Amino acid sequence: MRPSLALVFAFLIASPALADPPDIHVDVPNRKGLEVNVVEHDIAPGQSVGWHIHHGTEITYVLSGALNLQIAGGPIRHVVKGDTFEIDRDTPHRATNDGAEPVALLITYLRDKAGPLAIPVPAPSVH
């Protein structure tokens, strides 16, 4: 395992001991222009994250709560604590917390280093 990726995994194992872990940003060795980001994202009850894309792959683990996830072209999927999901590069998606509890997500992105993490997009048309 490459040293920088080993640091990411070591941090993930140790992070529960931290009160408020920082976001992690690590360059991908031998892959210029790519980085790995690991972030914790919370969604309050009644809140949503509108349609958006990432210039990279998103892998998410639901730490707590329940979420309605919609990926363009697919049905709404209900995900709960312990579930994981993957969203391919540049795929529009959105999420809503319709429950009474906050949702906590641990998200890993393998993405282009340049540019914003998330890019808002219009809702996909339904055919």
Model-derived features: where do they sit?
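Positively charged n-region of N-terminal signal peptides that target proteins for export
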Residues: 1-4
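N-terminal signal peptide c-region/cleavage motif recognized by signal peptidases
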Residues: 14-16
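Short acidic-glycine-tyrosine-enriched beta hairpin
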Residues: 28, 43-44, 67, 73-90
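Ligand-binding loop in jelly-roll beta-barrel domains
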Residues: 68, 90-116
